[in-house]
UniProtKB/Swiss-Prot annotation:
InterPro entries: Aa-tRNA-synt_II, aa-tRNA-synth_II, aa-tRNA-synth_II/BPL/LPL, Asn-tRNA-ligase, Asp/Asn-tRNA-synth_IIb, NA-bd_OB-fold, NA-bd_OB_tRNA. The gene is asnS. It comes from Haemophilus influenzae (strain ATCC 51907 / DSM 11121 / KW20 / Rd). This is Asparagine--tRNA ligase. Belongs to the class-II aminoacyl-tRNA synthetase family. Keywords: Aminoacyl-tRNA synthetase, ATP-binding, Cytoplasm, Ligase, Nucleotide-binding, Protein biosynthesis. PANTHER family: ASPARAGINE--TRNA LIGASE, MITOCHONDRIAL-RELATED, ASPARTYL/LYSYL-TRNA SYNTHETASE. The keyword ATP-binding applies. It is found in: Cytoplasm. GO terms for biological process: asparaginyl-tRNA aminoacylation. The keyword Transmembrane does not apply. Gene3D superfamilies: Bira Bifunctional Protein, Domain 2 (3.30.930.10), Nucleic acid-binding proteins (2.40.50.140). Its EC number is 6.1.1.22.
Length: 467
């Protein structure tokens, strides 16, 4: 019995020329020659390229099955690895046996037929779109990036912490949260003042899907020193744009005793590490994106890993924007939250490199960010990347209880709701810092795929929760 191998192993020469091997996958294309040969391009998802299998018409099921094969049919091909005379790949399979495990019922109506489909159409058939070149490549890049992130933090001595998806806290203080409830919507319990009585709900209080694992992560950082979370987060933000998802993944490290400068260095080291990994490990997929999606994909990543990060205070960044002579869609003044056009001008035109903007006005940032001595700004930072703008947001956290309480009061938050978070400041408080990286935004940056809904397997967005 021949050994089973992945197509990537065969194409990379891990199976010797002349050896008999079995590959299992799906037909991308079939073409027939007048000489009584059929050529199957078979893929199994292990790499971008399919392998070519050459089938003689003397194979017993040639007439009955091989000539009926169409795009999407599943096959098990056993054959000898031979050198390929054709350009494009070094080896091919001289088939000795082809077992058809599944035909496509009606090739004419198969949604993934060989013709090229628009990315918008593929969203409507998200259960089948992994079979396409583009979504298969995105999936492999996504895997590579996630593994590189875990590897980076492991090598740096971090511990991964599983923070809860159901929470009673609003980390961002923005209120755009999905409520979790088992109450009967047709018969809601009411308190004396007429409001919904959540004490009768499953958790005995109002509960939500998390918008961030940060606050929970801080509790572990204040015991294990260096932790990170990596998991799904949820925002009930009614934004139907190419940049927003209702469910997305976040990477959130948190480090005890770390300053804002330490935080910026960690962000730079992590991004460069994962970009080097994807350049080394997913070259075939990146070349596809370079050819068909964004010609600057590889150059952009190479420039990024070879760039020193610029740093600028928010106040100085506002001056740069005001003096640029450029007419922005959103007017520039001290106190605004930088828009994407401002961020991209700084990274792409002014610095021409990744840039860390730090020390933002306190009124546009979250309650947990450390108040600076000027009492107008907080020790917050954003990493801006050429080609996309903000890719990471973080801060040094407020470790002084009285300052934290005052900030919560200013923002209309009830300290009692955050009693456990305040406890961290009562019992051995330490300066600490962390940041958040939207994982899908990272994939958009790496692949050049413009719509964030195309880099997550099953996108969740306003009025869209199919599959």
């Amino acid at each position: 019995m021949s050994k089973v191998a992945s197509i990537v192993d065969v194409l990379q020469g891990k199976v010797a020329i002349g050896e008999t091997v079995t590959v299992r996958g799906w037909v991308r294309t079939r073409r027939d020659s007048k000489a009584g040969l059929s050529f199957l391009a078979v893929y199994d998802g292990s790499c971008f390229d399919p392998i070519q299998a050459i089938i003689n018409n003397d194979i017993e099921n040639y007439e009955s099955e091989i000539l009926r094969l169409t795009t999407g049919c599943s096959v098990i091909v056993t054959g000898k690895v031979v050198e390929s005379p054709a350009e494009g790949q070094a080896v091919e399979l001289q088939a000795e046996k082809v077992e058809v495990t599944g035909f496509v019922e009606d090739p004419d109506t198969y949604p993934m037929a060989a013709k090229r489909h628009s990315i918008e159409y593929l969203r409507e058939v998200a259960h089948l779109r992994p079979r396409t070149n583009i979504i298969g490549a995105v999936a492999r890049v996504r895997h590579c990036l996630s593994q590189a992130i875990h590897r980076f933090f492991h090598e740096q001595g971090f511990y991964w912490v599983a923070t809860p998806l159901i929470t009673a806290s609003d980390t961002e203080g923005a209120g755009e949260m999905f409520r979790v409830s088992t109450l009967d919507l047709e018969n809601l319990p009411r308190s004396e003042n007429g409001k919904v009585d959540f004490s009768q709900d499953f958790f005995g209080k109002e509960s939500f899907l998390t918008v961030s694992g940060q606050l929970n992560g801080e509790t572990y950082a204040c015991a294990l020193s260096k932790i990170y979370t990596f998991g799904p987060t949820f925002r009930a933000e009614n934004s139907n744009t190419t940049r927003h998802l209702a469910e997305f993944w976040m990477v959130e490290p948190e480090v005890a005793f770390a300053t804002l400068a330490d935080n910026a260095k960690l962000a730079e080291d992590m991004l460069k590490y994962v970009f080097r990994a994807v350049l080394a490990e997913r070259k075939d997929d990146l070349q596809f994106f370079e050819k068909h999606v964004d010609k600057d994909v590889i150059t952009r990543l190479e420039n990024f890993v070879n760039s020193d990060f610029a740093q600028i205070d928010y106040t100085d960044a506002i001056d740069v924007l005001l003096k640029s002579g450029k007419k922005f869609e959103f007017p520039v003044s001290w106190g605004i939250d930088l828009s994407s056009e401002h961020e991209r001008f700084l990274a792409e035109e002014y610095f021409k490199s990744p840039v860390v903007v730090k020390n933002y006005p306190k009124d546009i940032k979250a309650f947990y960010m450390r108040l600076n001595d000027d009492e107008k700004t907080v020790a917050a930072m954003d990493v801006l990347a050429p080609g996309i703008g903000e890719i990471i947001g973080g801060s040094q956290r407020e470790e002084r209880l009285e300052v934290l309480d005052k900030r919560m009061e200013e923002m209309g938050l009830n300290p009692d709701d955050y009693w456990w978070y305040r406890d961290l400041r009562k019992y051995g408080s330490v300066p600490h810092s962390g940041f958040g990286l939207g994982f899908e935004r990272l994939i958009v940056y790496v692949t050049g795929v413009q719509n964030i809904r195309d880099v997550i397997p099953f996108p969740r967005a306003p009025r869209n929760a199919n599959f």
